[in-house]
Amino acid sequence: MRFTKYIYLIIYAYACACLPLGAQNDVLAAQKGVIKGGYDFWVYTPADYETTQDSTPVILFLHGASLCGRDLSRVRRYGPLHALQMGRNIPALIIAPQNPGGAWNPKKINDVLDWTLSHYAADTTRIYVIGMSLGGYGTMDYAGTYPHRVAAAMALCGGCTLRDMQGLGELPLWILHGTADRAVGIRHSQTVVEALRREKNDQRLRFDWLNGQSHGALGRLFYMEKTYDWLFAHTVADSGRVADRLITITNADLKQAYRNITRRKEPMHVK
């Protein structure tokens, strides 16, 4: 229900306001080789995790092609992990797998999620997926394959490889793409929107074509508080699983993406 959504947003805002940067003890843990034949990944736990465990939301971040490989540190170059490094407070358990190359595999992503939830407590009704470029494809492929597991998904300048996109209509999905994207043309996202609308399966879909924005410009969304506000406004327990349409993202927001981030006084603990 909408009331429940805003309770979560109030809790999120309170957490952002109450954690002094100087007292942070958040942890970023590398998980290598723990899933046979699967992805290596990072797991981030926020500063207050010890007291919030079962109520902690989960964010799955899927990177683009430039971060593919076997060097897990590359996954920290942009996205939520880099936003945390810059000083953005994100009160969530963040899972960031590394794709060694090729398309993201929904089953392997799900294996990473399963492993993490078997080792870390979290709110399993509040699992979110966000990805950019190749990761935007991965976001839609994963959300469309496991729609009942994902509370909301945000796909940036990506597309979808699923032949059956029915699942994408079963959860709140926000697709964003720049009209000046020369790396992954906007048609990749438009095709998904058209397919869902054609099947009248777009009731939970949001899409925005950001005029004049390039491929890389959408990476700024990872640093914006609004991005996480929108994700956290949803839970799989919501009646009807309605997509929030009050939060907007504009070119002006992208321009100011870094302006209200307070630089960290201490680095996160990496292990």
Q: What residues fall within each predicted segment?
A:
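Catalytic histidine neighborhood in serine/cysteine hydrolases
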Residues: L196-A217
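Active-site machinery of serine-nucleophile hydrolases
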Residues: S55-V58, L62-N110
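Short alpha-helix in the alpha/beta-hydrolase fold that links the catalytic acid
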Residues: S73-V75, G185-A195
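Short beta-strand/loop motif that positions the catalytic acidic residue
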Residues: W174-H177, D181
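A domain-start/cap signature at the N-terminus of enzymes
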Residues: L21-V58, Y137, Y142, M154, ...
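Post-His helix in hydrolase/transferase enzymes
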Residues: L218-D229
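Gly/Ser-rich "nucleophile elbow"/oxyanion-hole loop immediately N-terminal to the catalytic nucleophile
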Residues: D48-D54, G102-S133
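Primarily recognizes the serine-hydrolase "nucleophile elbow" in alpha/beta-hydrolase
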Residues: T116-H119, T125-G169
